[in-house]
Structures are given as structure tokens and as C-alpha cells.
Amino acid sequence: MMHTPSRFRVAVSPLSWTNDVLEDLGQDTPLEQCLSEAAAADFAGTELGRKFARKARVLKPILERHGLQLASGWHSGFLAERSVEAEMQAVAPHAELLQALGAKVMVYGECGVMVPEVPLDVPMSTRLRLTAADMAAYAGRLTRFARWLDKHYGLRLAYHHHLMMVAETLDEVCALFDQTGPEVGLLLDTGHAAAAGFDYRVLLERFGARIVHIHLKDVRAEVMRSVREQDLSFNEGVRRGMFTVPGDGSVDFGALAAFVRDTGYAGWLVVEAEQDPLKAPPLETVSRARRFIAA
């Protein structure tokens, strides 16, 4: 239980209904079901998913019909490989959509410097890493990009530390945030922290003032351990159920609950768990998570 006050805005990711990468998971689930069930489970917002319209004039009335706000949406960035100018051009349609729908943060996931073609289908041990020099240069580009994103779109960059990406481990996240400017906000993902082998509380202590978005994800420790021991891929881990919603796994959310209550955190809390909807019926699963957050 998190004992989270009702003043906090709680959203849910559409990944519980339809996976963005593993297209067979939730392929036949219509967007209408996702949004109606999200609203029925008492969520105030949602993040973007692959079945969402990408034109504000189309998406806005759909969300309004369900009483949902757009909390944010993932941008697949490549600043580890390309220039700030190239990233500016690539992000424009996405940033314009978020801005038009009133979002205040943009989720940034680094997709550069990954194994080509099928980066989430290779053994986790084959993940590519940045050298110290490359990390420093990357941090500089990320800071410039974040500054521009805020100036031109009023969006705070929420950097998503993530398995199989260049900021997966605690050392990598710390190295990056020690070298980026304050314009670069942190998306704290409790599940990705646990799956990467570190305690999310370290990020609360070191970078709490820079946390602008939170993903509430839990981990099934036994499944995660098996995935690591067998050196399986990220996607195979998802299929086997390494992630789940808060309250169903091994993550202790007590410190996070205290953080959002006591620090003035004003961002969204987003329930996010990549699962097979046939094994984890979405409405039942996210409703249980919503009760866990409120209890």
C-alpha cells in the first residue's frame, strides 16, 4: 500500500492493454476498450500508445470523451548517435502533439547505441555501453536538447533509465545525471531500477529534485532472476512476466510514497507494466494497482 493522497494525479500506461513492441500482445484490443477501462478504474490520465491518433484534433475529443488527460508520451531519441539539430527535427511532430494536448513533460528513451535491428530480442548481456568520454559528450547534447525542448514547446524532458539502453545501471544513471544540466529531468521507473539491480531510493536521495515523472512498475523477482540467469532477452522477459503492476511484485513502494507526499512532487504517477493481457486481464489488473496506490 502507498497511502497516496488524492491530490496526486494518477495515470495508466496503455501497455497493460496493447504492447508497443510485441505487437501480438493486445493486437485485437481496441483503443476504446483501453480508454474506457482506464477511466472505469479511476485513472485521471494516460500516456500515448501505438493505437492512439497522432493528430491533436483527432485525439483530444477522444480523450475528453473518457475524461482522461494526456500525461505524456515516449519519444525514441538517438542523441547517443546523432546531433542535437537532427533530434530537434525528429521530435517536432511528437512535441507538437504533447504541447497541444497540455502535457508538461516528454518521456525520452535513448534508442541510440543499441544492438542493430532487434535490440530487445538479444540476450541482455549483449547490451552496448558508452565509454566515459562518449557519456560526457552525450550528456552535453542531451542538455542542449532539453533546454531547446523547454524553450520551444514548454515541455520538460523526462529521461527514462531503461534496461538495454545506455543508462541502465545505477552507475550509468548517476554518471549521466552528474554531467547533465538541470534542464534534464529524470523519469524514475521503480521496475527498471529493480530489474537493473539497484534500489530506486538511491535516485530519490541523489536526484530527487530532478524527478519530473514517475512510472510505478513492479517486478516478479523470481522471474527476473530466471531471465538474468538464462541470459534471455528483454522481450522474452516481458513475455514471461518479469514486470507487473505495483503491489503484485517485490518492490517496496514505501519510500516513494513518502517522497511524493513530503517533497512537493507535482508530476504524474503512472502505472506501467508490460504484460500479456491474456494472462493479466487489463481492467482487473490496473484496478488492483489503483487500489494499492490509494490504500
Regions found by a protein language model. Give the residues of each.
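Acidic/histidine-rich catalytic cores of soluble enzymes
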Residues: 46, 140-250
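Active-site beta-loop-alpha junctions enriched in small/polar residues
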Residues: 15-17, 49-51, 75-79, 111-113, ...
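Non-cysteine beta-strand/loop elements that form the S-adenosyl-L-methionine
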Residues: 9-14, 71, 105-111, 209-227, ...
